[in-house]
Structures are given as structure tokens and as C-alpha cells.
Amino acid sequence: MARGGASRRSFLKLAGAGVAGTALSAAASSYARIAGANDRVGVGIVGFSDRFRNSLAPAFLKSAGELNFEFVALSDIWSKRRDDGGAFVSKLPGGKQVALARNNEELYENKDVQAVIIATPDFQHASQGVEAVRAGRDAYIEKPLANTMEDARAIRTAVKGTDRVVAIGTQRRSSPIYQRIHDYMTSGTFGDLVSVELTWNVNQPGRWRRPKLVSQLHEADTDWKRFLTGRPPEPFDPRKYVEFRLFWPFSSGIPDQWMVQRIDTVQWFTGFPRPRSVVANGGIYHWRDGRKNWDTLTAVFDYGPIDEGLTGAAKGFQVVYTARMTNSAGGMREHYFSNGGMLDLEKGTVLPTGGLTEENAREMELKANQLTPITFAAPGSEEAAELGAPAERSERKSGAVTERSPAQAPASGTAAAAPTVSPLGENTGPDESTIANLRNWMECVQARKRPNSDIEAGYNHSVALCMTIAAMQTGQRVSFDDAKQEVVIGPPTGHVHFQQRSSRTDLPGGREP
């Protein structure tokens, strides 16, 4: 039991008296100041997923002993995953039996839970984050933070109304190697960014599919109404529950799962909080297996000073994001270009490739512009390996890894400390960025400081995500109304406000070829 538990109970009795979430948060913050950094922090697990099992749990354990954190409870609405999760945690190094909760209301009745890790389906992250901070808990929330602006505004408002420490799972912001590259990119040495090319190509018929797990899910074993979490009512569908990444409004698929991390990196490196405009095209071109989310996407972003509008020239640049699940040629690339050369983020190198040569500069009486080569990480080093999460590196080899999928715990008797394996057969495990991001959150929980990947970073990547989804759903160029914090169709002036499509028949994948 956490030291100071009796005091915490007295603070949290406010919840049973029906006190508003802000008052509860104020009481919890008072407790945090009294307890101090040396008191053990009890952590609740919200959602026993593959992302938690394969990456977050082992990453957490890297720092938990030193920083005095421990798992004390687990909440999952599906009885199978709840029981499997309890068994999994008990087999972790230093593990023990944790309290099991059927839902988050039960979880937050447990006074030993002082913070939570949320690793549930995409569309639940924001609302469950709101629940956490209103219950006076600190939270680590997996990416994406939100895929509707309504949810994004709700979690941002909730966090800003408290002093809860909330970190988002865009883990690159805590990685030393990415931080060094960020510092270089913001130093001015690279020159003005003119273009970014982001690519993610795989060929995986089983990507985000879970037919065996789907067959094990029965409505009586879960709480379908809670699963929907504010989405429109619809009949129970085990496939949408387990394979949610393939179906809007539970996920947009490629943008939710893959694009967010890279767009967050662009925004972090450049300081721009959001795109000025987004257009997108794509469809379901090959994997016609009942999914509604696209298997192929191209999205084009215009970035630059917001007050200059869509045609502003100063320091503006274009980002082209392409992804396909149908052919892996081209693999994964993140290339940043200036007039003087390029940053290959996957390799951690800056080269004068494509920069203005002496010959071409002389023609217009200009000076050559050739970047000085830099290698941020020695080839074969741990830092070189860090430039890309383990799941991404595994995909380059075999195209066989899945992230943040509904979890299947090891069979009884399986050693939890062994390397974890995804349902498609590849080792994943914690990457150094995730270890660093969780540690940063844990340290900030103790020190009551803002984490590297904070609520503003999460909100901003959610804006870019929602703009992309709107472009997919409408086929039009979209922008953003800063005054109303809404995605709009057309330019910021003379626009039409976008109405988020969330019914079962009005889907981003509806424009199938």
C-alpha cells in the first residue's frame, strides 16, 4: 500500500460526496505536495492491450524500482483481458496480484491508484484521460490523444483546469537522440525547411486483423455500451471491438496509428502548432475484407506562419505523407529538405544531397548552399537503432509487427520476463524512446512538472489528425478556425465549419474506388 494512503483516502472521500472534478483535483494536488517524491506511487492500468503488454509495461519497469512506482490495479471491460492482464502483471519481475476493476469507476474507487497508464483503443484515449484527471489522477495517455475536435477540446480543458501531470505517448520528445536532432533543426544551421517527405509502406494482410481473438469475444463478457464511449449507438460487433483500427468512428486507421507520430515530430522540430491546410486522397485499393478505413493514403500539409494565411511565403514548407498497406517497396522514410541539403531522420544523418551547387548558383550570381555532413549516431550504435521504434525496425525485416492491438496475455505458466512477441510473430519490446518518455512522466509526477510530451503537444497533433480526417471524408482542402478551435472546409475566411462524421454509414473509407 502506498505510504500516506490514509491521507489520500480522506482527500478522495470528496468524490463520494459528489464534489465536482475540479475540487477533487485540488484536493489530490494538496496530497501530492504533502506526500513528497519519496512516497511510492501506485499506478493503475487502463486497458490491457498489446501496446501495454509488449512496450509500456517493460518500459515502465525500467524505472519503476528506482523511482518508487508500482502497478496496483488494472481496469478492462472485457473479462478475458481483465483476467489475462492480472495474471500477466503478477508474473512481472517483482510483480504481485493487482486489484482488478470491471470499469474505470471501480478503478478510481481504489485509493491506492494515484496515477494511470491509458492504452485503450484510439477513440477512448481522450475521454478516459478526462476521467482520470477529474478523479484527481496523473495520467500517461497513449497516442493519438484524440481523433475528433470535441474530444481534443474536452481533454485539453480538463487538464488545464487541474495541476495533474499528463503525458502523451509521442515518445520521441523524450529521446536524447531525437532531442539532439531537434536542437540542430531549431538552431538555424539547417536553413529554412522547404519540404518533408514521410513514407510508411508495408504489405501485411494480417495488419490489424485478429480473427481468432474476434471469435473469442461474446457480448456477455464485456460492456459494449461503455466501449462505444460517446460514439453513436450500434449493435454489438466483436470485429469492431477487436479490429477497431479498421473502422471509423473508432479509428481512422493509417492517420491515427502511423501518421500522428511523424506529424508530431514535424511540429516539434519546426515550432508550428498545426498545418495551415491539408488535402488527402486514397481509398481501399486491395484489402477488401470488410474494413472501412483506407489501405492507401496520401496527405499533403501546408505549414508556415499562421497569420500569413494559406499563401504566406516566409518559412513555409510542404509535408507529403504517403502510406500503403498493399506493397512494402520504399519501406519507411523521413526526409527533411532545405535549400542546402537534407536530413535523413531514419539514418540520423545530414547531407548536402540536393543542395544548391556552385555551378547552379553561379548561373544566377548566387552563393552555393551545401550543408556540412553530420552523423548524429554512429552506424550500428544503440542510438542509431533508436531512430525508429522496434516495431518499425521489425517491419523493415519481415513486415510482421502490429502495434497497440487488443491484447492476448501469455498462456498460464509463460514467463512474463521473456521477450514479448506480437500476434504476427515478431519480437517488439520497449524501445528507448518509450522508456525515456515514461521515465520523464514518472519524474514529473514526483516533481509536479510539465512532461516533455505534454497536453499541448497532444492537442496540436490531434488538430493535424482531425484536419486530415476531414480532408479524407470530404475530398476537399481543409483549414482551421483558431477562434472556434474547429476544422473548417476551405480557407479560414469564407469557410464552412466541418461536421465530424461519426455515424456507421458515413465513414472516411466510404469513398472506396
What are these regions (language model features)?
Residues 143:
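Short basic (Lys/Arg) and small-residue
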Residues 56, 81, 85, 128, ...:
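Alpha-helical packing segments of well-folded alpha/beta enzyme cores
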Residues 36-40, 188, 192-193:
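Immediate post-signal peptide segment of exported/extracytoplasmic ligand-binding proteins
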Residues 154-172, 181, 191-196:
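Rossmann-fold dehydrogenase core element
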Residues 180, 192, 197-201, 206-456, ...:
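Contiguous beta-strand/loop segments that form the cofactor/metal-binding neighborhood of enzyme cores
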Residues 72, 99-101, 167, 279, ...:
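General small-molecule cofactor/ligand-binding pocket signal
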Residues 51, 124, 146-147, 173-174, ...:
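Glycine-/small-residue-rich active-site loops that bind phosphorylated ligands and cofactors
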Residues 1-138, 150-165:
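N-terminal glycine-/serine-/threonine-rich beta1-alpha1-beta2 phosphate-ribose binding loop
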